[in-house]
């Protein structure tokens, strides 16, 4: 069925499953992946994954990327773009923070945008440490 004919939950499941088909296939080494929580301005802990390239672990500072998955603010997840974030971190030699921002329709605008801004501020503060 087309996505617009599915329930929100069905659309999210279909999106995650179809995203697995776009796995870029990363050769070893795989990046280090840390699951963490980024604090939102309202105190909500937002799930996130931090991908760090294996080969550059001795480098004192690496470029950082805040990765916000696609999906029109309704579908998409940390899992739907996991392989892409891993590939980006390893191939570009950067740290990638992938954020599980809050999705519509459960969360109204501008929640997702605020979550993204909060994650950006968190990433910048962590980089300065």
PLM regions and their residue ranges:
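Short strand->helix junction
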Residues: 73-74, 102-106
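Alpha/beta-hydrolase active-site loop
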Residues: 107-128
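Serine-hydrolase catalytic-loop signature spanning alpha/beta hydrolases and amidase-signature enzymes
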Residues: 67, 72-75, 80, 96, ...
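Glycine-rich phosphate-binding loop signature in dinucleotide/nucleotide-binding domains
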Residues: 57-60, 129
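Short beta-strand element of the alpha/beta-hydrolase
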Residues: 48, 60-72
